[in-house]
């Protein structure tokens, strides 16, 4: 693709050789004459100028003293992501049902759907047009998949769950397993039936081996545009808002509410019925206690989660703890000497 065409497609401007062909995206370290590179910040500018990439996508203020071929974009990361998708389109699956797949007679299969080997689709399921279902997937009864979804190999969607249009579910994820609910009867636990479901909005992406449990009653909800990384656990009756991002190995206990546009780091633990406000940021490894409220726009870290400034102050004090212990021991020694001297004078 020519640089001129790519810039026009991105709605950006270019400088340099507009007729230069770029055929793939590459890192700055490995890029060659026909590769497209990316400079996202001023810090990377020097590396970008030294790169052998045939073309660079850069921010508007990028210096270009060597008159390199560049594409200036107001949002360079977004522009580069779109360019990567254009230069490296996903392989199209041939529509149709593999001979080893099992599809219930009452299932509704949209046009252009591809169902891979050894997959199953249950009674009353509805599969939207142009959806791709990989090998070994299990789609339960009355499941609804929107248009243009992609289910990679070995995804399981339990009965009665809904997944919106253009959803991406990576290998091994499980949607709609029973929530962790039990009642103590005498000296033993009895299972609390989990009769709710899971509903996932449009344009969501669910990482590999992530599990989203069905509600005990009602709905476990994932809002549109939300992205969950690998190995995330969402407990029963959680309500995750729109355009929330969650990094790997994070766990949501039952009944947690996360409002729109929150950012949650990796290995975060969130207790029952906690509430995370819109645009809040939870740092990696922090712990939010049961029923705790993290207010809108707040940045928290540590366990128990607390405002970042407070956490950093406490961390700085903690690092000085060995020194402070020595100082305290010295103060005690000197105090004892003074007290001993006073007693002798008496």
Question: Where are each of the predicted segments found?
Answer:
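Structural signal for interior beta-strand "rungs" in well-ordered beta-sheet cores
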Residues: 38, 96-307
